[in-house]
Amino acid sequence: MAVEEKNSPTGAAMTNTGILVPSSQQSLPEWWTKTQKFFSRENTITPTFGYFRLLFGTQPGKTDIALIVIGTIAGIGAGIPFPLLGILFGELVDDLNSSTCSTTQAPPGGYQAAITTKVLQVIYVSILNFVCMYIHTGCWSMVGERLVRRLRTKYFHSLLRQEIAFTDTLPSGDVTSRLVSDIEVIQAGTSEKVGLFIGTISYFVAAYIVAFLKVATIAAMLMSVVPIYFLMAFGGGHYIKKYSGRISTHINAATSIVSSSLSHMSIVHAFNANARLEALFAQHLVSARMDALKKAITHSIQFGMLYFVAYASNALAFWQGSRMIADLAEGKPSKVSVGAVYTVIFVLLDASFVLSQMAPFMHIFASAASAGDRLMTTIKRQSAIDGTSSEGDSTISLASEEIELQDVTFNYPARPEVPVLQGVSFKIPPNKHTAIVGTSGSGKSTVVALLERLYDPITGCVRVGNRDLKEINVRHLRGSIGLVQQEPNLLDRSILENIAHGLVSSSQEKHKHLLPTLLGPSLSELTEKIRQGASEDEAVTEQGDVVREIVNLTRHAATLSNAIDFINALPDGLATRVGSSGAELSGGQKQRIALARALIRDPPVLLLDEATAALDSTSERLIQAALNKVSENVTTVSIAHRLATAKDADNIIVMQKGRVMEQGTHMDLVARDGVYAGMVRLQNIGKFSSSSSIMTESTQVDANIDRSLTTDTLLNKEEKLSLEQGVLDEKEKPAQLYMPEEADSLPTEPENEKEKPKQTLWATMKGSFPLIRPNILLISLGLITSIMIGVSYTGEAVIFGHTVGSLSVCRGGPSIRSSGMLFGLLFFILAIVKFAAVIVNGAAFGWAAEKTLYRTRVLSLRSLLRQPLEWHNADGRTPGLLVALVTSDASALSSLTGTTIGVLFSTVANLFAGVILSHVIAWRIAVVLLATLPVLLASGVLRLRVMAQYQKKHQKAYAKATAITVESVDNIKSIAAFSLEQEAYSVFNRSLKAPYKSNMKSVLHGNFWLSLAYSISTLVYALAYWWGSQQILAGMYTQVQFFIVLPALLFSTQSCGQMFALVPDISKARIAASNIVDLLSIKHEGDEEYDKTGSKASAKHTDPRFNMLEDKPRDVEAQLITTTPPSFPTKGMGVQFRNVHFRYPSRPNQPALDDLSINISPGQFCALVGPSGSGKSTTFALLEKFYNPASGSIIIDGVDITKQSGAAFRDTIALVPQENVMFEGTVAFNIGLGARPDVEATQEEIEEACRLANIHDTIAALPDGYNTVCSQDGKQFSGGQRQRLSIARALVRKPRLLLLDESTSALDVESEKHVQDALAKVARKTTIVAIAHRLNTIHRADRIFMIEGGRCVDQGTHAELVERCESYRANVIHQSLDA
């Protein structure tokens, strides 16, 4: 049952369908509802309607309506005063003409009084303009802030509602791109710039109204060009949207590479894969560059045409006006005065100028509409399986119902051509244990997904009792099932919250009253207090009885899952944060937490997909015994590769290639001597000399387990020892093994890094210059054309002043006509010159920006991939935040070589040219007006400071919300399985509250200075006319001089006002540049080559950070380069650990290795076994030099790697991690990543490695074969298939040392046998070290090291350890199918 959100941050309520509806929606007027429906139509495709659909198609509430209406009215009001100024100025021109042409000496006092009156009127207009501008910029800024918050929440909620098939086909990096890039574009296009644009349109319309009232003939002529403006705007918007879509596709693919690389830095380092990943990343960026250039050229043509039409139309107005004034001078009948013509030309010239300044805004609005459409596509999508819906039967109980699959066929949407299930039919009896076994990729996990209704069958059906699964409410169904997945996924919350997630949708009536607390902030606040030092009991008491009940249930579930002791051993206990996807916990710990999450809801149906695969055999046996007790009256479905965990099932279903081969009990299937019996023979661990002894031992162990289940703990003696020493469960520790979890684990980074001095502006500029330097010619061309554009305004002022002077009736008609023709022609020539300059400017800066963006992104990724793991796991350095460095920050920095810097330089050129010309023409007027410039600049600088502080303060705030969204999509199966949509949504909304409130305060503060910067120019108008008229009346200057100086300076001040609209972009670029310079300034080993004396050995490369940057990177996927491989050594490595002590930096009081000493001879196959947390995986971390030991030596081939700089020794080491990682790219690319850094794997070598890993046939059967694209993490492949791909990636390296961390845990017995045979082939030239809990995989090892408590307690062959090592023998017994 969905729960209503009483106080949603968006002012919305969640209906029983899970759809957000504004709380005020029902009271909205009918016209508004119809407007929303109109602009929500999917067939409304023009950019204009797309923009209105963005504003009105997201269910705005009353507040939003009020803000839009008030902001629009204020924007219209802000545009009206300026045409009124034109009327006043026209009357003033008539007065000045009358005084200069009069044959009698008129007293100056009359003219001075009229001027003073008009100046006061200008001041009143200025104040009105400031008020209107502040209102509309404030309102529209709030509209934009509220809109993007609604879009964030709606987009996130829509993602949560979608069926898993949708997220399976979602491009990797798409969510990050939508919530970072698209949201930023939308906010830029729906904030204060909208009010400014409305004001400009209002100005434009009002100007034409005034023009028609004054001189209708000229106004009508100029009115004909208005449709051209709209044609250019919409035509350009269409192409800009087209190219933006293409760019977005390429950038999303590139972002996926960044995201997956930064999320799996251990693999990147282990295989030195950074160069190959960088090349693939660059390849996607190059694909985007041509479309970006086309977009820039389209924009510059659109912008240039606006200038051309504006200036050409003014040329027409000058010419036609001169003819009318000439008629008046010749005494012909005419109602036109010089002032009236001046008013028309002045207001239309200024209106055209200001409208042309809005061209960049139109580009921003078009981009915002395009981004909004991309988001709305997902927001409006109807989910095929909606886990938040109230539809379906919510009364059926699964406790006593039979579950049946009837002739089910199924294909995954990501690979529709590959059949997964083919006519599968079987029954799952109630309250019985059904086990499903079979080869990897046979469809076992798919069956679980169908039972959870994460997918629907293509044909056939799944039934519960006599009801089709589709008839049952999805939330109710999933609430009745406890699921433990093959790869357990946890959310970035505390252990307490993760286990309590199992209660959120529990079908048990006794848990219903807990739901409001589970969805609220109580548990988060509780764990935060505990982490801050409060005792658990005190914090729980403060939160109340419901929270205490949840904590007690959590502890009980943790006890059942054998997790309570390791939780208690953690410093923060249940309050310990698990990190992104549980990265702060080991695999075994995550699996136990996931098991507790399933058991806490006391479900009638339990689905276990390899639920104990990551555990050592003793822990597995303990948990299995516990499961047997709690599942006595539970329908249990388990998937297992370890047949020892399935042999006691009431029914075993054997699957192969998507079909059911046979089913029955263990004894029946063994007797049948079919597929299952063959699997049993493959998995049994050898024969023992004394079977009776083994049976006796087995009986004793079972008795010990039964006794342990009656006590408070389920841990065995070895695990207690490990936990008392604080050793992490790092057998399956990708987080600790390959990534440390705390910020204080930074040996390469000083503790006071957070207090390091802020980059000065000069340091930032100096550090950014190497990024810009290669494009200096393009930038120079852009700067030259920017100066031309800026100076053209001064040229316009010169033409304008002479034109106004030539229209005086004191001159004869022929002279007026010839002057009008001349200056009209000059204006037309100016239009052509400016058109060409704008196009060249846009193309030059656009190309320079794209090349700088490419260079910055590639170098940023290069630097990130070269950082040590400790750096990546420092406080606040999540993959999501680091992705922003490569995407958002690089994009912001590139704007400094694009349109932003172009506008800035043209404005500065305009300012200097206007000031210089004014001083040359009429310095007395200019020097007074120039005194106002510092006031204008000061208002802009103050706003710059406000926006810079705002940007820096909240840079991480919304990144947290983005990280929550990305994490939720990455773990969408867990969220769907446990119906955590509402919980995730609540956490997401809470993360938005703080930045939203602070943003609103910044809006009110920052827009004050923006409004002042815009409005102050009208005060300059007032001062200019007052002082200029005094100078004319005093005979110091002529009208021509005045009307040159006036527009020259006023255009300059107006340009400054426009420049301050770019302050947010400049502020972002400043912060982004500082971030990127900081990143690129980090030194790496190998940046400089030194000889033995410490001096530089070579001065050839002045700064290696900027070397080897290919402008046209090779196609790393399509071209498998055949190279002559170097002569690799033909024998394995020798490895020695001598008295090694090690503690993880984040837990300095807890030893991980305690005087470990082992010796592995070259070419040996050795194994590390022992209980979870004994230090096995830590040895791999030290062998890969992810860490350095506190003391002792690690010697590889006679070289102590702890005393050597660099990590070149990794070139001949290959790692198969427990959690198998795939990157965005083809299968061939993923396998080729394993090749040594100086060699590209050929297709033949890749196929050979795949054959050895028993995955070649599977790949070859795919429609695209080795060119099949892997999504991020390879989710279209099964767990076993991914594991075999990882093995192939390791084998293609031809390693001398092969490290296998549970490398066959997800494999069926047949695949496991193939892999074991392959390893036997390569073992002749390779040293193999394996960590394993499945002892049948290592019982033939040359030497087995028994690791307990961080030290080696015994070593020998399998037979030797069975005879003399009690703990090893116990493990053998637990895994024996004969026991």
UniProtKB/Swiss-Prot annotation:
Cross-referenced SUPFAM superfamilies: ABC transporter transmembrane region, P-loop containing nucleoside triphosphate hydrolases
Domain ABC transporter positions: 403-682, 1135-1374
Similarity-based family: Belongs to the ABC transporter superfamily. ABCB family. Multidrug resistance exporter (TC 3.A.1.201) subfamily.
Record's note on what induces expression: Expression is induced upon exposure to amphotericin B, the allylamine terbinafine, and the azole itraconazole.
Keywords: ATP-binding, Cell membrane, Glycoprotein, Membrane, Nucleotide-binding, Repeat, Transmembrane, Transmembrane helix, Transport
Classification via Pfam families: ABC_membrane, ABC_tran
This protein's name: ABC multidrug transporter MDR2
Gene Ontology terms for molecular function: ABC-type oligopeptide transporter activity; ATP binding; ATP hydrolysis activity
Cellular-component GO terms for this entry: mitochondrial inner membrane; plasma membrane
Binding-site list for ATP: 438-445, 1170-1177
